[in-house]
Amino acid sequence: MSYRNEYDLIVVGTGAAGLSCAITAKKRGLDVVVLEKEPVFGGTTALSGGVLWVPLNHHGRKQNPGDSVEAVRTFMMHETGSYFDEEAIRTFIEQGPKMVEFFERETAMKFIPTLYPDYHPDAPGGMEIGRSILAEPFDIRGLGKDMERLKPPLKTITFIGMMFNSSNADLKHFFRATKSVTSFLYVARRLLTHIKELALYRRAVQVTSGNALAARLAKSALDLGIPILTSTPASKIVMENGKAVGVVTGRDGDVQEIRARLGVALACGGFPHDVKRITQAYPHLKRGHEHLSPTPTSNTGDGTNMAEAVGGVVDIRFKEPAAWMPVTRVEFGNGEVGVFPHLLDRYKPGVIGVLKNGRRFTNESNSYHDVGAAMIEACRGMQETAMWLLCDRRTLGKYGLGYVKPSPMPIGRFIRNGYLFEGKTLADLAHATGIDPAGLESTVREYNQHAVQGKDPEFGRGSTAFNRYLADPENKPNPCVAPIGHGPYYAVKVVMGDLGTFDGIKTTVAGEVLRRDGSVIPGLFAVGNDRASIMGGNYPGAGITHGPNMTFGYVTGNYIADLSQGRKFSQW
């Protein structure tokens, strides 16, 4: 794609926030270019679940007409605690629904409602439905030749490359394929379609979740004539008279300068692979413990580093500096390693998580972020930050465990490559994993005592709508709790990972990058995970990165357009 050396706005990054900012500004009449470090576009968004938490959106209002501004504000006050930002939260509540309507009306973006509860639905202002929406599945042939530039989904959460919608409605058919004719036929159709796509295009073309979100946004940008320059990393902000006026970038091996008449918006995905910064920010890394992130390895903090280099402040202050995700390391062979995020198995009845001492430490059916935070705290003073998810053979066959798929898929290779641990008895499993055998046997005995009645008095599994949402509704009386039966027993070792950083560049509500003295750096903006999260290091619901990121991308795009037209932010 051809490009010039001067635009109104330069956006650095092709995730949901960057493309939202670019599209909004373009629709307002600005001349925009988007730069992408990788040879493919989509960023972390393309690997994600594609869910947006946008309270009071028009889809959610149909599901839950009783939701209100007051309820959302109360919920956010509770969830963010001392980090509650009145102006930012008010703007998010006001502009989020407008953002959804704008993108559905003006672009190729389409959303569908989900059944996700808030992650803490019983908290003040929490809701059991209506706040999370999902990108509608998309046929990437609509991108034309640019379909080859769409970042593929995370390999570990596909089945032979086939994607699943991150709403529970899609996945339930795959878990029920051997029990229900309807589900069997659904799965068979999906598999046949996918095999045809692989034969013709060497990848899935019917994409869902974050891949659909990234694809729809990219199509919208490309349809508007916005150049998306891949393999074009930005390395430096060009400053003149204290104002950001462009970036230095490398393209085709040449160092070049692209000028911005109005501004530069950083949307580089935060710093989950900036080793120096995360070692300072992540508590378990300070202890020298393992961390694996499924986010793109190219997210090395380019935006935060460029902002700092010109006087911007990176706000490292949240107790939880990132969105935690318990993960396992997956060996694919030939030296290829993947990261599997534990999104589903922890909720299932008959699966429990224990530390090296053999003891449970939290409600396994809480959100990934809450389980991660509990794991970091529980492993304080231990030699590693890790837990083992374990179950019996029946449960493994029914639900799978981590990257191990349910029956009838074979498990032998996972045992041979060390991903899956096996033991005929609990003591054998403890010996194989290094777990304390007495602690493990005691834990399972105590757990089973109550599990036969569907109860978990120690941690309350199944006590919230969110606990139950990804569990097994056919397991009575508690969809999250079942006893661990006879051996053999199986376990996977889970370490800490993340879905992206919460700490980030300090900005105004409109996204203007701030100096340490609180003044604005003219012409420099930050959106998405480059910008400090409004959630204060908490994770209140499904899509609390994409929802605010797209909303504030929209806000920043409008703000820059307003500046160009002599309008003030407060007027629109």
Protein language model features and the residues they cover:
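Extreme N-terminal leader/targeting segments of oxidoreductases
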Residues: 1-9, 27, 211, 215, ...
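Helix-rich C-terminal "cap"/substrate-channel and partner-interaction subdomain
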Residues: 381-488, 556-559, 563
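Glycine-rich loop(s) and the adjacent beta-strand/alpha-helix scaffold that form part
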Residues: 204-211, 223, 251-330, 546, ...
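An anion/pyrophosphate-binding glycine-rich loop and adjacent beta-alpha core
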Residues: 129, 134-185, 304-306, 310-435
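N-terminal Rossmann-like FAD-binding beta1-loop-alpha1 element of flavoenzymes
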Residues: 9-34
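A glycine-rich dinucleotide-binding beta-alpha-beta segment and adjacent secondary-structure elements
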Residues: 236, 243, 439-534, 538
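Internal hydrophobic alpha-helix adjacent to the cofactor/substrate pocket in enzyme cavities
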Residues: 306-313, 441, 548-569
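Conserved N-terminal/central alpha/beta ligand/cofactor-binding core
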Residues: 37-227, 350-353, 360, 394-397, ...
